[in-house]
């Protein structure tokens, strides 16, 4: 490993460390003891799940309590709008247009952050504490302070994510979510053993949980490394005994084309609304809706299943453009044996991608929901879904592949420099 790659890894770790430091900076004017007690008693619902994705920043009411979710939500909205309005889609493909597009995403993130910050501030009044619940200062002052603090925190996370993507290794936003989930693993393990010690769950249940986790990890690794290889040929004339030499190659198409995006998008759409509704303890109707959408309920997991399939198809159509691949092949003198270059190749690739996306979307949806079904059947008293495991393993694999690719690229440049 050369110095450039080592430097990128250190930069990535440095920014992730900064992210974890921010998770310990609380918003001024709140009763942290009341907040902690509230989250201890609500760890099994949407609040607990939202807290997990934020790296326990919510339970500390940190300035990054909203995490990167406002940015993800704004990205979802813009992607859906791009699919609806051709001019917006065209803007994304241009260099200057992409800058304008990202600027719109940032402005939308600011708006969503402010709306969510106000919602959180109002919800804090329902937490047992003083006259204003867990709020220890004037309510109007706190709403301004909390909105500014959370907006600053979310903007900092966006900046950290962009810096990691540009200067570090891997996708910055995915790594932030990865770091948040991983940071909660020690406390989750400790809490599980406490349940064993107190007799809430027995040894057989613990062994069952471990086996489910290991089986989930194995399934994720197996599918994430699976790909369909489409053979292609490049006809090139070479001066070798006056014969043409065909150089064979292939197009790798992953079984899971959409990657980690569908479960992240689905979680973003379900978790925060459920969290806000969970705080509406005074309204019986809203509380009933919150209970209905609890992560431990069937409705939440059915919606998660359906949303993941939708986003898998939607995002696969964005990341895999069969027409562009077919055009690039034709320009470079490549072709798929038995198929006509151009439209015939594009149709074939689109058909293959559609079939793979069907199985890939089902895989994502099942991995995100089946572990919960198994754990619930065992009678375990806490939520365990495969979404967190899926995100952690997928991001780890993707980051390792990018590091490996940069190492190979570095070796190639070294060989080119010495004349090989």
UniProtKB/Swiss-Prot annotation:
Record-linked Pfam families: SecY
GO molecular function, one term: protein transmembrane transporter activity
The keyword Chloroplast belongs to this UniProt entry's keyword annotation: no
Cell inner membrane found in the keyword field: yes
One cellular component term from this protein's GO annotations in UniProt: cell envelope Sec protein transport complex
Primary location: membrane
Function: The central subunit of the protein translocation channel SecYEG. Consists of two halves formed by TMs 1-5 and 6-10. These two domains form a lateral gate at the front which open onto the bilayer between TMs 2 and 7, and are clamped together by SecE at the back. The channel is closed by both a pore ring composed of hydrophobic SecY resides and a short helix (helix 2A) on the extracellular side of the membrane which forms a plug. The plug probably moves laterally to allow the channel to open. The ring and the pore may move independently.
Name of this protein: Protein translocase subunit SecY
Organism: Helicobacter pylori (strain ATCC 700392 / 26695)
Taxonomic lineage from the root: Bacteria, Pseudomonadati, Campylobacterota, Epsilonproteobacteria, Campylobacterales
Gene: secY
